[in-house]
Amino acid sequence: MAIRVYNTLTKQKEEFRPLREGEVRMYVCGPTVYDYTHLGHARTYIAFDVIRRYLEHRGYTVLMVMNFTDIDDKIIRRANETGEDPKELAEKFLRYFLEDMKALKVKPADIYPRVTEHIQDIIDFVRKLQEKGYAYEGNDGVYFEVRKFKDYGKLSGIKLEELVKGARVEPGEGKKNPEDFALWKKAKPGEPKWESPWGEGRPGWHIECSTMSTKYLGESFDIHGGGNDLIFPHHENEIAQSEACTGHEWVRYWLHTGFVMVSGEKMSKSLGNFVTIRELLQKYSPEVIRFFVLQKHYRSPLDYTEEGIQHAKNNLERLYNTLENIRVAMEKADVAFRWDEEEFELYETVREARKKFYDAMDDDFNTAEALKAVFEVSNAVNRYLTKVEKPKESVLRKALEFFKIVSEVFGLFEDYFKEQKAGDEEALIELLVSVRAELRKQRNFTLADKIRDELKALGIQLEDTPQGTIWKRISV
């Protein structure tokens, strides 16, 4: 089954066909760094992390770009409130954001472009729009003339006449029409500013993403993502700028995450009903937060309650208990000289669940449905282990392989599998030490020394003592 994604642009699910065979280029709108990351933000980044992981699991090479807006009205306001330098304030919260994402096991983007490091690129982009007749200079900045872009509203469904109705140009604004938006803002006293053809100033919000995504992913790329709240005006304006500049389709698939809700309202800083990732991590493990998010499809609203996240914690513990049951059983499991009905029953459950997992993820990355398949395997494993006196290692390994796929795609159980891998490595090292000891007894020192030297090159140092050979890890 081919991967199908819901495209906000076409309002339907479509077969996923990237522009370049075997490669996916994706851009996710990053944070404006003026405060701590809350669960509403993290929901989006966890969702796109899983989308990226799944695409990579399916064999695609993914080039992922996520920006940082490190100069903006919100940053300037917060800096004025706290008395901090806007640059230092943005740098501080940028670092906090990266720390939070690392804690949540969100894989780093390949490129994290910052607005303040791409000012000249933004100026060049605005000049192109001006040259093509889509932008004009007003007394307080440079504006995009929305009426000149005939496809305006194609993402959000907003009609131009709806924007114009009841709107007006405020006194002192330099725009021609109320719907026009700023590409470049002329400097105000005390604000950060850069030289430009229009005098000192700073970029508008929407132009930043158009510029940086195009710079690193090209004039057309596969996926642009963000939260539902960015569809209008941010993403609508991005399309207008980018397609006005290039003259062709900019992004093939637009993906948007649903809101995190608290008592029926969107979690947001403006309402003050948010919980930061740092607060959550004081009470719950990173995997509990990931699991809580993945219990819902990424486009659906996600209701945040203490009971809900505790329920996620309990469900995750059930799966960890199953993995531990597998580990213990495999230590004493028999080699399979035959399979009986119980082995075939577990095998069939794992096989069918694996198909359900892939079908769910192929269907617009439906993590909620995929998790149902995971619990089917969990329940089947525990039933099997209560039924049989001597479990078979080979059928348990089938279940474990399925859990490894889930781990790779969902970013769960990673510590468990690291421990398993470490245990396997140690067993292999012990085997090589034993083989080397036998070679030394046979006075085959050439081959014994080769094992010692090869292990050292891999970071394992052997020391021969009167009590036998011991080994330890070293840096290489």
UniProtKB/Swiss-Prot annotation:
Keyword terms of this UniProt record: Aminoacyl-tRNA synthetase, ATP-binding, Cytoplasm, Ligase, Metal-binding, Nucleotide-binding, Protein biosynthesis, Zinc
Chain positions recorded as Zn(2+) binding sites: 29, 209, 234, 238
Family matches, as SUPFAM superfamilies: Anticodon-binding domain of a subclass of class I aminoacyl-tRNA synthetases, Nucleotidylyl transferase
Motif ('KMSKS' region): 266-270
HAMAP family assigned: Cys_tRNA_synth
PANTHER family for the chain: CYSTEINE--TRNA LIGASE, CYTOPLASMIC, CYSTEINYL-TRNA SYNTHETASE
Protein name: Cysteine--tRNA ligase
Species whose genome carries this gene: Thermococcus onnurineus (strain NA1)
